[in-house]
């Protein structure tokens, strides 16, 4: 596969040799971070949702692996990730008191930790957790930011992508923004549209 402005680095043969889903997530992340046209150093984050065995109950549970706070996806390793019980993370909406209390939600992420060796979860964790997709990439490509920061960014996004990329206006990253991303996906699905991504106003691309 060839692209005009970015390099397509994915190697099907190499990916096929990676049997562990978390390792494959790391491989994907490193490729995205290798091209600074896709995201700036230290910017963006990636995630994968997998099924794993709960060490206490032995039951299969859904776990989300995500780049931890800080770090760079281009050099990401497993030790730089956070792994969280997805059901616990999503249940935090039951105690969410509103946008004025975003900071207290970050502390509650620690109650959702699955892997005790996890790095601290980032403020973007709910943005990934509330979306229903297995693989999620959040990047800051210069081209996307040019659209996201434009005065008519929403209109430009609709015209360029024909409704396949949603739009959510700028808001500080955190729990409330995660709920807005989910609402954007839900609204599109109610119209029979499956979004391929979401443009975040003055921010970047999901």
Residue spans of the language-model regions?
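Glycine-rich flexible loops
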Residues: 1-206
């Amino acid at each position: 596969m060839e692209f005009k402005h970015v390099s397509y680095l994915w190697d099907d043969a190499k990916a096929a040799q990676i049997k562990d889903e978390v390792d494959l997530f790391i491989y994907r992340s490193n490729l995205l971070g290798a091209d600074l046209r896709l995201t700036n150093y230290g910017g963006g984050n990636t995630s994968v949702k997998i099924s794993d065995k709960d060490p206490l109950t032995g039951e299969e549970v859904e776990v989300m692996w995500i780049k931890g706070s800080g770090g760079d996806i281009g050099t990401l390793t497993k030790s730089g990730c956070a792994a969280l019980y997805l059901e616990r993370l999503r249940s935090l909406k039951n105690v969410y008191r509103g946008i004025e209390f975003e900071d207290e939600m970050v502390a509650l992420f620690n109650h959702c930790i699955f892997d005790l060796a996890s790095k601290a979860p980032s403020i973007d964790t709910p943005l990934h957790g509330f979306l229903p997709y297995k693989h999620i990439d959040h990047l800051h490509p210069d081209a996307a930011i040019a659209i996201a920061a434009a005065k008519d960014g929403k209109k430009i996004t609709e015209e360029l992508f024909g409704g396949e990329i949603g739009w959510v206006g700028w808001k500080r990253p955190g729990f409330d923004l995660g709920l807005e991303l989910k609402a954007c996906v839900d609204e599109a699905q109610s119209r029979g549209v499956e979004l391929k991504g979401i443009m975040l106003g003055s921010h970047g691309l999901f």
